[in-house]
Amino acid sequence: MWAPSGQGPAGWDRRRVGARLRAALAGLQELQGLRATQQARVRGALGLHPAPGPRGQELRLEAALTALREQLSRLRRQDAGLKTHLDQLDQQISELQLDVSRSSCEALDSDSRPSSGFYELSDAGSCSLSTSCASVCSDRLSPSLGSWLPVFQPSKSRSGIGDWRPRSADETTVPAWSPQLTEDSRLLHGAEGTGRLTGMFRPRPVSTGDLERVLPADVGLQRAGTDAAHLLGQGIEIPAHALDPTYQRDLVARGGQEVYPYPSPLHAVALQSPLFALPKEAPCFDICSPPQEPPLVPVDENRTQPEPIRELGSAEAYIHRLLHLRGQELPLRDVGQEQGGDTAAFPPKPCGQRSESTCQLEKQACGADRGGLKLGRGAAKDSLKQHGPVSLVGAEPLSSPLKEETIPWNPCVHGDNTVGSSPCSQAQQPLNDCGQGPVLSPSRVLGTESPPLAPEPFAYTSCTTGETSPVKLRMGFSQNKAVKVRRRVSEKVPRLGKQLPPQPERQRVTERDPSRPHQGGLSRRPTLAREPPGRSCSESTLYPVPFLVPVVVAQRESYPTSPQAFFPMEAALLSSAARRKQRRWQSTMEISAKAGSVSQPGPSMGLPRSPAKRGSGPRAQSRPTLARQDACARCESDPSEHSADCTSLYHSTIAETSEDEEASDHTANRFGDESSSNDSEGCFRGSRRRLAIGSAEAGQGGWAWPRVPPQQPSRAPGNTRPPLPPVPKLCRIKASKALKKKIRRFQPAALKVMTMV
């Protein structure tokens, strides 16, 4: 059945075009056979019932015409009095002996309408009714005379039906003279077929009364009905061609869900569609590869088809080669067995109608791809165990909520034993490795190309399992965390005045980090929150584009990760205008900071000991306190492109401001609590101390912080200052020392309005 052709794409094209042409011919023959069978069915149905429909319609039309005739005759009988009056007027006209022939000829030459005489001027400009009557009356035969033939001659109603139509009022006023009536009847009998009178008068235009003149009365509708039945039953007699037995079987779709039965229009269209083509044995193939299309297979088709698979050996070898290049090997036989036609070992579909072709091989290739993906996931988990700190640095700032002392952090990342899911058990090994090496080292491994890592499923699948027991997980190590925060504050604050180089701070962060996963506290403060994930501090100074690290104030029920955590570049671009404003403010602050540091360098050194004797009570947790802490912490955590010494000068300026505020007692009364002045003394230190106290209280008596809606993430700085704890952001103060004093004399609402500018 296949035409001999060479190998290669040209031979494939010739074979495909030939198969499509043969399929189209078979589809057309099938459609012709279907039409012949349908015509035979219609003839049989019409022979059983002798067409009552058209005859009934004809009877209805005849009844309607009869009713119209009766109505017209009744109207004419009602107008009998008018007719006699008009007859009398016509007699008066004849007595006046007018020139009837001349006026009638002029009227007919000018206008064929019978009412034109009303407006015709004759006899020295006198218009009269006699003139109008004379215009339609003549000694010869007028077409108006035929309108009264059914009234006076009811036996000839059928012969004069051509002229029996509605007339105008003046047309019915002509008297019926007896010699003209006989002449009229004779002429009508001579011209009854055409309905036109033999004379010099032109016929009237067709009106509603000319229905029966146009349509033949007896034969018209009956002929139409018989012609319709004849044309329906006649048809084109097409001999039933011998169809190719290859196409005389049901077609099954590739998925086995659609079945096209053989003698059906859908089957014929599917055969001649360009989406299908037929190889030697299989009736129908979908397009699956360029050389050949995969199958809509017949039900009774044999499953071993060596020729199509032998054709597609090169394509399958190409697919195998591609898959081998990608490192995902197919669990199939060698190419020689696939080309040899030994395809019966593949398990058939449950429908039992599939034949082996490229689609099955591709399905198995897809299954192998899925298996390769599973293996790839396992290998990724193994590689994650080898490079544990890499996944920790990438995924920990994203999956764990960063609000301190309020929300349990992710047990997956920290390897908590209370949650017994398998992803968490897989995540415990990287954390044990993390305790043995520095945490900042994987940022060099990741480099600038690696985004924040969150593709692995265990990075946040078991966060929902950790939601069930947040209080139990919180209360475990809150006291240890509070002591640790106090120690860090005492270590960190004296360095601000000394303006140490950034490298010792970097080393201190590196030394403190490895012990944190083993303490297991839920209120763990992320040490890398100030840095972009996957980048080191040296890289952030090399690349001028600042990244945003999301410090999310998450809610207690769920742990949503902000989209800016996954796309820090977009978030950095969004907040570029705000950063420009901050740079403008910080240039002013830098000037004031330099002046304050030259005049009073001392208070920043003596600052950590002043809040030790006060401000340690639980009163420090009120809401205005949060506003004040936030103001100081926002001043401290603003992104800056300056060096670390400018930053320490800026902190000394804040310390001066808070020390000068200690003398003003009315500020605390304005804010409504006694601890606001204590907070303003040591802004960054007091805020951290309060965080430690809040963690101790929360470990004993439940949740201590009020619920704050999620705010915008803070910007990651480009300098190497040690990271600060994220606190709820309420307002922001960026002003000099004198301006801060003036601003704080206002109410808190006015403070918010003025500082948001």
From Swiss-Prot:
Organism the protein comes from: Mus musculus (Mouse)
Record's compositionally biased regions (Basic and acidic residues): 505-516, 631-644, 664-673
TM regions (residue ranges): none
Regions of compositional bias (Polar residues) in chain numbering: 645-656
Family statement drawn from the similarity comment of this UniProt entry: Belongs to the dapper family.
Gene: Dact2
PANTHER family registered for this protein in UniProt: DAPPER HOMOLOG 2, DAPPER-RELATED
Keywords: Coiled coil, Developmental protein, Phosphoprotein
Summary of the function given for this chain in its UniProt record: Involved in regulation of intracellular signaling pathways during development. Negatively regulates the Nodal signaling pathway, possibly by promoting the lysosomal degradation of Nodal receptors, such as TGFBR1. May be involved in control of the morphogenetic behavior of kidney ureteric bud cells by keeping cells epithelial and restraining their mesenchymal character. May play an inhibitory role in the re-epithelialization of skin wounds by attenuating TGF-beta signaling.
GO molecular function terms noted in the UniProt entry: beta-catenin binding; delta-catenin binding; protein kinase A binding; protein kinase C binding; transcription factor binding
Positions of the UniProt region annotated as Disordered: 486-540, 584-684, 696-728
Domain topic, free-text comment: The C-terminal PDZ-binding motif may mediate interaction with the PDZ domains of DSH (Dishevelled) family proteins.
Identification of the protein by name: Dapper homolog 2
